[in-house]
């Protein structure tokens, strides 16, 4: 009996992909989300991501105004930082250049090391500031215009001690007619020793041997050590005033005098270099003579300092450099004076003349032979003691 018929294997037929029917229209999904579209019968390498066919337009950015060509937006923070760094570097280079330029123009011509028998140094720093009648660099026309005369050599028209300390700055005017002892000294050029010459006017010491003997005489009669020396002549003074555009002052009364050449009317006005020089030089026609002149000099320095150290001058190179050039070209200082020392002197002057310190004449006891002025030595000793110990000044004129 035959066995059961074996099971037949049907050949496997691979059917082709059936075409998809039409996609039914999507119903409106909640919250406006568009469902992903189904594949249209081919292997789509991009299908499967959630962002495909969802209505998102690729290459159009995120709606924040991106570059249509795919370039990154500018990094303004980085640009600002680079700009600031560049400005700082430029300012640094200019500052360094200005420092070396100014330092090269300083006339370090006074050697204080040759001054003999110097007093012991105290606290703070003491400057001797001198205005001389030097006519160096002035033509005949300039001398006539500035009423300087034609006297050979040079003398001192003003002398001031400026003390810079932690307890306040002090400026003391020394009348040129002060009756003092000119001590023995060694000639700055000859090297010869000269004996003391007895009482004389203070400015006579400058006439004999210039700055070194003047410093020696001031130290000998006060007991106060002078740390630095600064001197400016007629021409330099007038140039500085003209460089800042003149100095505004309130003239208390009409002033006219032929020796100084001053001719000013009462009231507030701007003095040019010529007028300013006449104002600080005048002593004839003033009730107090040399004492009144020192007060006028203090008033003018106050106005000059306050009007020079302003943003309109310091931050304006077209004004700052002419002012610095005019001052440095004619300013004579000691060999150890640095630009920092000079700046300290200037700012202390501005502080004092602006009311932030003490401004006074050397205390006077009365008159002396030859129209001289005798110092009140009791007050002078107290004043020097306060300065040497850097104490607030309590002495009055």
Spell out what each predicted region is.
Residues 2-397:
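Non-catalytic, solvent-exposed segments at the cell envelope interface
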